[in-house]
From Swiss-Prot:
InterPro entries: Leucine_aapep/pepB, Macro_dom-like, Peptidase_M17_C, Peptidase_M17_leu_NH2_pept, Peptidase_M17_N. SUPFAM superfamilies: Macro domain-like (SSF52949), Zn-dependent exopeptidases (SSF53187). It comes from Haemophilus influenzae (strain PittGG). The keyword Cytoplasm applies. Its EC number is 3.4.11.1, 3.4.11.10. Mn(2+) 1 binds at D268, D345, E347. Its main location: cytoplasm. This is Probable cytosol aminopeptidase.
Length: 491
């Protein structure tokens, strides 16, 4: 899809003009102009009750006298001054549905005239594009009959300000990153294993002059003492690989990097502490943290942000086997702390703790890890907010700001010293689980023991990384949040 922002005349020929109308006869400038061009036809529709402005209600008019456009699509925008982000998304989706049904190829949108609460024109355009791209997404790689794709080729926003051009640039890059994350996450685990994840990182690096890649294999992990990471991998025939993508693009090449770490369990059966069979197929999504880091690295490379960023994809697989690690095992982590394994299904933190130690070598400005870490986070926050844990208030606030800006929502959970009490073990420095209560927090507390040398935040995306049921599939979250956070570091 090609997106443009330019001033257009309502008399211009096109497949379709999209126009918004508020309730209570609140009309935009363009509505009044088209009404004049069509000799009061739109006002007649309002008087007859056919045009109400009700939220996301659409009416499609064809071949109007006085209008060069083949079609005029009018969409209701609710009450003026009360339109929320969620309602705006419903409007864009309603418009897209009609455009698809009518095989429209090119559109000029005057929805740039509608007002959103606490949002500007930049956001109006960017969110429209991201919504269109997200809604149009299809994953039919393995279907013999492919889904019908939209024929829509051109979408023009009626404005030519610099803000609009930046919105298109940001939206295109973020949408590309989200699609990449969704594609990898939706791949079946018999194909998407740790080696596949490393291969995708290689392809990304080869297609960007600013990206380079280092892959750490099991032999190197053993030399480094990454015993917790390796223990998780022991039950699988698929070897672990940690892919380190480096984006060196800051004006000061010696600037400390921002490090993103993504949990990449390409399949998690739970190991010896086997998960229930129901919905176990969804455990291919246990690598969505790595997928989101991959997507974010793709987005910032496309944007060419003047930053130094390192993205680590911690690829691994957790399966039961005669060689698998066991409850009761004691592991010596890379930083020397010992961990008693009480549950092999609490494996993500074991992979992450060694990865978080590994990234110390980069002397990072800050580190953000992203992981589908705990079911407890889903119980606490549901599927709308990612859980945020951090030892740094400024970093946490910056991430929450990015979450608000993008509507890729997050909610901060507490992290006080008391939670460390639940991680005590009579036999080792730490236990890998903290009991029944506050599981999302104690998982974060566990990780905090391996992040003493830098500013750190943890995003638990177990509830937000994928959907279930009829709309089953990866969401691509939190690529938008992470990319916005990085954009904000440039400002």
């Amino acid at each position: 899809m090609k997106y443009q922002a330019k001033n257009t005349a309502l008399s211009q020929a096109t497949d379709c003009i999209v126009l918004g109308i508020y309730e209570n006869n609140k009309f935009s400038k363009s509505f009044n102009e088209i009404d004049q061009l069509t000799q009061g036809y739109l006002n007649d529709l309002v008087k007859s009750g056919e045009l109400t402005g009700k939220l996301a209600q659409t009416i499609l008019l064809r071949d109007l006298q006085g209008l060069s456009a083949k079609r005029l699509l009018i969409v209701g925008c609710g009450k003026k001054g009360e339109l929320t982000e969620r309602q705006y998304k419903q409007i864009i989706q309603a418009v897209l549905k009609t455009l698809k049904e009518t095989n429209t190829r090119e559109v000029i949108s005057y929805l740039t005239e509608i007002e959103l609460k606490d949002r500007d024109l930049y956001w109006n355009i960017r969110f429209a594009i991201e919504t269109i791209e997200h809604t149009n997404y299809q994953f039919d790689h393995f279907k013999s009959q492919k889904a019908e794709t939209s024929v829509l080729e051109s979408f023009v926003f009626n404005t030519d300000c610099n803000q609009a051009q930046q919105a298109i640039s940001h939206a295109n890059a973020i949408s590309s990153g989200i699609k990449a994350a969704r594609d990898i996450a939706n791949m079946p685990p018999n194909i998407c294993n740790p080696a596949y994840l490393a291969e995708q990182a290689k392809n990304l690096a080869e297609n960007s002059t600013a990206l380079s890649l280092k892959v750490v294999d099991e032999e190197e992990m053993a030399k480094l003492g990454m015993n917790a990471y390796l223990a998780v991998s022991k039950g699988s025939e698929n070897r672990a690989y940690m892919s380190v993508l480096t984006f060196n693009n800051a004006l000061d090449k010696n600037a400390k990097p921002i490090v993103l770490v993504g949990k990449g369990l390409t399949f998690d059966a739970g190991g010896i502490s086997l998960k229930p069979a129901a919905d176990m197929d969804e455990m291919k999504y246990d690598m969505c943290g790595a997928a989101s880091v991959f997507g974010t690295m793709k987005a910032i490379a496309q944007l060419n942000l003047p930053l130094n960023v390192i993205g680590v994809l911690a690829g691994c697989e957790n399966l039961p086997d005669g060689n698998a690690y066991r409850p009761g095992d004691i592991l010596t982590t890379m930083n020397g702390l010992t961990v008693e394994v009480l549950n092999t299904d609490a494996e993500g933190r074991l992979v992450l703790c060694d990865t978080l130690t590994y990234v110390e070598r980069f002397e990072p400005e800050l580190v953000i890890d992203v992981a589908t870490l705990t079911g407890a986070c889903v119980v606490a926050l549901g599927q709308h907010n990612s859980g945020l844990v951090s030892t740094d208030n400024n970093l946490a606030n910056a991430l929450l700001q990015a979450a608000t800006e993008t509507t890729d929502k997050a909610w901060r959970l507490p992290l006080s010293e008391e939670y460390q009490e639940q991680l005590k073990s009579p036999f080792a420095d730490l236990a890998n689980i903290g009991g029944r209560w506050g599981g999302a927090i104690t998982a974060g507390a566990f990780l905090s023991n391996f992040t003493k040398k830098y500013r750190w935040a943890h995003l638990d995306i177990a509830g937000t990384a994928w959907l279930q049921g009829a709309n089953k599939g990866a969401t691509g979250r939190p690529v938008s949040l992470l990319t916005q956070f990085l954009i904000n570091q440039v400002k």
